[in-house]
């Protein structure tokens, strides 16, 4: 049957392929597994991801009560280091994110405002953007499943995010008496890190991803950051 725009209208049989109510059947949906943590301003040698599910660990969400447990803003893991039965996940790509912060209070993250004022007659460096450069410019990622590693890669900017907030503007002045306002932002760029072949995580299979640095890398800004990992792929689960 032709539609108003000349396309073909799916039949009821075709529509059934996308039904969410199919008793006894499985379904596959596009989804990410994600986990965020606080990056302390003093730096750290290793961070382990996907080990603290919702309700455990420490949140790194902007504005959250310091030291409170993780919520869905931090992770969508419901078990520690594994998927519940009967779920499975096909990992297609890996992304690593770093968000600069604006507080050094323990167990607290506060978002960084990229707009800054340059005082008259001075030149300043955007230390928060150097945070990302310092942290992601070294170190390595290790994807460990079962009893062995399936991926080791360095440096960490090898895993750019597919999405992000871009702030692109500049302002210059030659005035000796007027302050200037500028904005600056930075993020990893390049092709996404696709796994070839893809990797399947079956129900109750233990796994973790660690970010590792040979020495603790402090943030030049003196503030805590927020660092996260996304596994992009297909989630397999029972239909309803």
Can you name each region flagged by the protein language model?
Residues 1-240:
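Beta-strand-centric surfaces of beta-sandwich/beta-rich domains
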């Amino acid at each position: 049957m032709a539609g108003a725009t000349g396309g073909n209208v799916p039949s009821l049989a075709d529509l059934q392929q996308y039904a969410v109510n199919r008793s006894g059947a499985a379904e596959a949906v596009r989804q990410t597994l994600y986990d965020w943590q606080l990056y302390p301003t003093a730096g750290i040698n290793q961070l382990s991801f996907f080990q603290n599910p919702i309700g455990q660990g420490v949140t790194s969400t902007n504005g959250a009560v310091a030291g409170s447990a993780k919520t869905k803003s931090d992770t969508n893991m419901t078990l520690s280091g594994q998927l519940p039965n009967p779920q499975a996940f096909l990992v297609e790509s890996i992304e690593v994110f770093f968000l600069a912060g604006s507080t050094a209070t323990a167990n607290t993250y506060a978002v960084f405002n990229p707009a800054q004022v340059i005082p008259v007659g001075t030149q300043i460096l955007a230390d928060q953007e150097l945070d990302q450069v310092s942290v992601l410019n070294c170190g390595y990622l290790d994807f460990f499943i079962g009893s062995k590693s399936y991926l080791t890669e360095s440096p960490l900017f090898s895993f750019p995010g597919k999405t992000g907030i871009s702030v692109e503007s500049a302002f210059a002045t030659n005035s000796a008496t007027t302050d200037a306002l500028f904005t600056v932002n930075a993020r990893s760029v390049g092709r996404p890190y696709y796994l070839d072949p893809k990797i399947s995580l079956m129900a109750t299979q233990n796994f973790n991803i660690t970010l590792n640095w040979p020495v603790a890398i402090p943030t030049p800004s003196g503030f805590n950051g927020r660092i996260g990992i996304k596994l992009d792929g297909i989630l397999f689960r029972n239909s309803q």
